[in-house]
C-alpha cells in the first residue's frame, strides 16, 4: 500500500474519530461485519470517485490557473470576488448538485490564492454554505431532494415552488453575511507570478470524460462510467489517479457504517416507531436534529419510512445541512479540499448561527404558507 496513503490516514483525525465511534457502537448491537458493506451507499462512493478524478484532472492541467488569472482581472475587491464565488456555487448547485458544484468552485478558489491575497478558508466556508442553500431549490440539487421528489408525486416546477421561499430566505441571509464578512478593500496581487502553463489536451479530455460519466450516471451505469474515466486517465495522465485524496472515500464509508450501527441500537428502535405521531414542531426539530448527527441524506431515508414526503420534511432536512459538520456531506467535501485543519473549527462559527436562524425563520415561514 502507498506510504503516502498510510501517512494521510494517520493524520486524518476525523477518520480516526469515525473508527472509534464505530467500535463503540459495535459493543451495543449484534456484531455482523458481513452486513457492513450493504450499509454503504456505493452509488455515492462511485460518483465521488469519478468526480474527484475529473476535478483533479482539470486541476493538474493548469486550467484553473488560467481561469483564476482571468477572474482576477475582472474583480477588484474581496467583496466582489466573494459575492461572485458564492453566487456561482449556489447557481451551479441547483442543477449540478451540491457536491459537483464544490468540485468546481473550491479548486478554483484555492488556485486564486496563488494570484492574490484572499481569505481562502472563509471563502470555502461560504461556498459550502452557498451550495447547501442553493441546492435545496430544485429536485436535482442534492440527494435528499431527489429522494423526496420521487416520493412526493410533484412535478419539477411544483417541487421547486414549495422550496423557493426557503431558498430565497437562505440566499438573502448568506449574501447579507457576505456583505459584512468580506471587506471592500482592493485585492492585493502577488508580484512575480509567471503566466500559467496549461495543457489544453488534458482539459478537453476531462470535459469529454465528464460528459461520458454524467451520461453513465443518468443511465444508472455509474460503475462502467467510473471504469471509463479511470481508463482514460491511465492512458492520458496516470499522475491524476495517484494525486486524488482517496482517503475521503474511506471517511464516507466509515460514516455510512456508523449510521447503520446507530440505527440498529435497540434503544432507538422504539423511538423511531413514534416519529409518525409527532406534532409538526416535533417532526421539524427531529428532522433537523437527526441530520446534525447522521447527515441529512440518511435522515431523509430513515424518516421517509415513517412520514410522508411533505414540505415540512423537505425544508427540515435541508436546513439540517447547516450547523455541525456531519449535517451535509457537502460540508465534509468542501473542508477536506481546503486541506487546512483550522477551517474545521472556523466553519462552525458561521454554520451554527445559520442553522439556528434557518430553523427559526424557516418554521415561521412554513406556518404562513397555505
State what each model feature region is.
Residues 39, 56, 61, 68-70, ...:
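Transmembrane helical segments that form the transport core of multi-pass membrane transport proteins
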Residues 42-44, 73-84, 115-123, 200-204, ...:
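Membrane-interfacial loop-to-helix junctions in multi-pass transporters
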Residues 56-62, 92-104, 134-142, 262-264, ...:
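Short helix-coil transition sites and intra-membrane helix breaks within transmembrane domains
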Residues 85-87, 91-136, 301-315, 343-344:
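Hydrophobic transmembrane alpha-helices that form the pore/transport pathway of multi-pass ion
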Residues 160-171, 175, 285-370:
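C-terminal transmembrane helix pair
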Residues 6-14, 34-44, 154-166, 195-199, ...:
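Interfacial loop-to-helix junctions that mark the boundaries of transmembrane helices
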Residues 2-4, 172-231:
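Long, contiguous bundles of hydrophobic transmembrane helices that form the permeation core
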Residues 1-19, 77-78, 197-205:
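N-terminal membrane topogenic signal
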